[in-house]
Amino acid sequence: DLFPLNLERIEDQYMAMIHRMPSCEESGLKDDFNGPICYTPDGNPLVGPAPGLRNMWLAEGFSFGITAAGGVGNYMAQMMVNGEAEIDMASLDPKRYGSWMTTEYAARKNEECYDHVYILHHPDEERPACAGLRTSPAYDRQKAAGAQFGRVNGWDRPNYFGPLDADENFDHDSRSFRRGKWWKYAVDEAKAIREGVGLIDATAFTKHVVKGPGATQFLDWFTCNKLPKVGRINLTYALTGSGTTRTEYTIVRNGENEYYLVSAGAWTAYDSDYLRKAAEDKAAEFGYIEIHDVTNQWGVFAIAGPKTRSVLSK
């Protein structure tokens, strides 16, 4: 439903329009619309298969109305008929949001997104609304150590560690179309791991346990690399029907029919939905398969660098 017209809200803009186009003053208002605008927390619409359902598709959340209708209709048809679009649609996928998203989060991020529509955007800028929604157990220690956080899939993750006395606007003020103040800190961290050793909080990565009598056959079909032996680890990919990359997985084989899968932290609901639907489709062929999302249950640290073994030996 539309709201009552409130010209006072647009008086400044209306007068500016008349100044720019004087004929508008004589023509007057012929019609009016005052209604809500659809927004999503990141400003992108929701386009693609609905999570957890089959043959259910979403195309909503368009903040600029019908302007994307032609393109969305084309790529939606490709997904429905061919199983995927000819371009990467991940940034619009409805599953980029998970069960962690609260009503308050949606409201505050939508307001923030609306406020930034016509503001200059810098590369990799981070926006503060709803900071701290999802954090690892090490969050307070990281913050005390100067961590400058970015937000992915609701998680606060350290982008880099800045000066201990940095104020809350340090990262925002360091963003630029050139090298910002963050540059030297990121370089130092990369050099430390490349030449020495470093500790990485990987808690926000997506984590699944796949097990059951059909797990080995299923993952052998689902991924394109040879599965590791028990107690070993390898890198592999799940592919689309046309052979392009769908998801990158690190697989740890904990038992004959039990596997621990790690994938990108940004796509937990996306990967979980794909895994579950694929397992359901193949259960009759391969046998019983369990899929457990343990992302929120397990905290993870990774230690990396050429001096890793000497640290672990102490």
Q: Where does each model-flagged region fall?
A:
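Glycine/proline-enriched, intrinsically flexible loops and inter-domain linkers
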Residues: I87-D88, D93-K314
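C-terminal catalytic lobe of FAD-dependent flavoproteins
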Residues: L2-R134
